[in-house]
Each structure stands twice: as C-alpha cells, then as structure tokens.
Amino acid sequence: ADRVILQFPFYWYSSPALLKEWEDEVITAGWAYAGAHALKGKELKLVVTTGSDAAKYRKDGEYSHTMEELLSPFEVVAYKVGMNYAEPFLVQGTATIGDAELNQAAADYVSAILD
C-alpha cells in the first residue's frame, strides 16, 4: 500500500482512544523508525468527522483552535516516520448535516481517497 488512511470521529478535540492505542502498538521503534522504515514514503491521509460545524474550529471560533492545529500530532508522527502528510478530508457539522450535504460529502470522500 502506498497510503494509510485513518478515518475517525473527532471526540473532545482528539481522536478516539482506540486509535491512539493502535498508534502505540503499530508505530514502533524497529518497524516504523529507529532502524526500520516500513512507512517511509507512504502517504498519511486523515478522514475526520466533527459534530460541530467548521466555524467553531477557528482562532476566533468557540474552540479557539483550528482543525489543522488539533490534528498536528498526526502530522508530527508522519514526519517522524518519513510519511507524507496529506491534507485531511473533513466532514464537519455532522450533528446537523442535511441529506444533500451528506450526499455531497460522500461523493467528495470517494474523490479524496481515490485521488
């Protein structure tokens, strides 16, 4: 595989604990870095959903942080193991999204992961 896609809902400004556990178990010294580079040159693509709308994830928004900032730990891990960090695919406002918006997001998702 040339690409690793991590798809998850955003809970409390982070990824679910199970994804963090996966990172701890898989991205290890001797396999992903420090002597071996199994992920080097591969692309890391995040697919993330948020219940809150995008306006809340701005410097001047309710959460005072951007999604780019909140997802930066994934970018740092990608850099550490020699991966290419791709622009995340975000679907925001899922708590109130309508059918038309959801259908468009689904079509955009297919394009994003097949790109």
Over which residues does each language-model region extend?
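Helix-loop-strand module that forms the ligand-binding subsite of alpha/beta enzymes
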Residues: A1-E75
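Glycine-rich phosphate/pyrophosphate-binding loop and the adjoining helix
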Residues: L71-D115
